[in-house]
Amino acid sequence: MRIALGVQYDGAAFCGWQAQPHGKTVQDALERALGEFACVPLHTTVAGRTDTGVHGLGQVVHFDTALDRAEFSWVRGTNAFLPPTVSVQWAKAMPDTFHARFSAFERTYYYALYVHPVRSPMLAGRAGWIHTPLDDDAMRAAAVHLIGEHDFSSFRSSECQSKTPVKHLYQIDVRRSGHFIHFRFRANAFLHHMVRNLMGCLVAVGRGRYPADWLADVLAGRDRNLAAPTFMADGLYLAHVGYPAEFAVPPAQLGSVPWSSVWADLDPQP
């Protein structure tokens, strides 16, 4: 039997998603909890690996098991063995044709950026922060140059293991709400550090360091050295993974973040 899980986690509490010998990752915590509940080791396959500090609101995994248990039993039973910084939101039996990674046709990330002269300790690890004003319109104009199918080598980490740097970026939205600016990135897939590198460039344009069309040159150059430094991970959230309707994957629970109403207005889930 194949089971899919929806997982939420506080990325600040872990050293990324992927299992490591030190055991301090989200995958390590989840598989330990699943093993405790199932009384047998279980291995998970994830929709998208996230880095240290990156949060998961709509992460999806699957695993195979011979155990026949009610779907909600997997939720309650696994959560009983998880730390408070990670939680299974739903469980669903899936056909063998479902694959958490390869069945997905799109991913959506949000970035919450706090723009204020003084940082807020209440937002530590929850939102990015910059103390200088930003030009929203300039960032929107710059984002236009990135939309479409492109070689995103200029925004790719040197550690990226993707087979190709070509991705299709469907949409970038920028929305101000009080002292926050919220960004939404939707694509078929993302390269390692791609969203944080895009954020670094958009913020550089917003600060007036470069004109909006600078991003067109960075993209065309296909050279990471042309782009701005990688932006902080704190405000980055994997919010949604899109799957074909036949799998009826439950929607992510975005209401667990304070600015969920802004995100819902910015991006009603498909």
UniProtKB/Swiss-Prot annotation:
GO terms for molecular function: RNA binding; tRNA pseudouridine(38-40) synthase activity. It is an enzyme of class 5 (isomerase). CDD domains: PseudoU_synth_EcTruA (cd02570). Its EC number is 5.4.99.12. It catalyses: uridine(38/39/40) in tRNA = pseudouridine(38/39/40) in tRNA. SUPFAM superfamilies: Pseudouridine synthase (SSF55120). GO terms for biological process: tRNA pseudouridine synthesis. InterPro entries: PsdUridine_synth_cat_dom_sf (IPR020103), PsdUridine_synth_TruA (IPR001406), PsdUridine_synth_TruA_a/b_dom (IPR020097), PsdUridine_synth_TruA_C (IPR020095), TruA/RsuA/RluB/E/F_N (IPR020094). Keywords: Isomerase, tRNA processing. Substrate binds at Y109. The active site is at D51. PANTHER family: PSEUDOURIDYLATE SYNTHASE (PTHR11142), TRNA PSEUDOURIDINE SYNTHASE-LIKE 1 (PTHR11142:SF0). Formation of pseudouridine at positions 38, 39 and 40 in the anticodon stem and loop of transfer RNAs. Belongs to the tRNA pseudouridine synthase TruA family. Homodimer. This is tRNA pseudouridine synthase A. It comes from Burkholderia vietnamiensis (strain G4 / LMG 22486) (Burkholderia cepacia (strain R1808)). The lineage of its organism: Bacteria, Pseudomonadati, Pseudomonadota, Betaproteobacteria, Burkholderiales.
